[in-house]
Amino acid sequence: MNKHEFRQLFDEKILILDGATGTNLMNAGMPLGVCPEKYILEHKEVMLELQTSYLNAGTDILYAPTFTCNRLKLREYGLENNLYQMNMDLVALSKQAVAECGHGYVAGDLTMTGEMLYPMGKLQFEELVDIYKEQIKVLVEAGCDLLVVETMMSLAETRAAVIAANEICDLPV
């Protein structure tokens, strides 16, 4: 889906997004302190059930569970070398839910890295853009219909994610 197609869809109807994925995963037994994406890949049935329930309740857009699946967050768990495969598998899981229900779109989900930008931290703006580009390239390859940037604590980091998206693809953000 490109930005024009998304705008047409948005003009035709109110689009309903999915719900509190993290909260529901914790209610389903995900312990605190684990990598959520790794937990989901080890408990695919929990995520698939949650996402199909969202779609059956009328959700139009599922957020692929790629929320913190960027290099910096994955590094906290020693999983940064798994970025490509984890993002591919997580998007595939959401696409499976859409296929099983026969409707819906999958949004690649991006959030903050947890690192402060210079001068408050060591991370340079261009490095941050590159970190988002790395994940977005995989999300596009995996077949996301659009991208979402959420739960950001910094306008600069939000800007970096949007710039990265616009440099990589024509997907709606």
Language-model features and meaning:
Residues M1-V173:
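Domain-level signal for soluble alpha/beta catalytic cores
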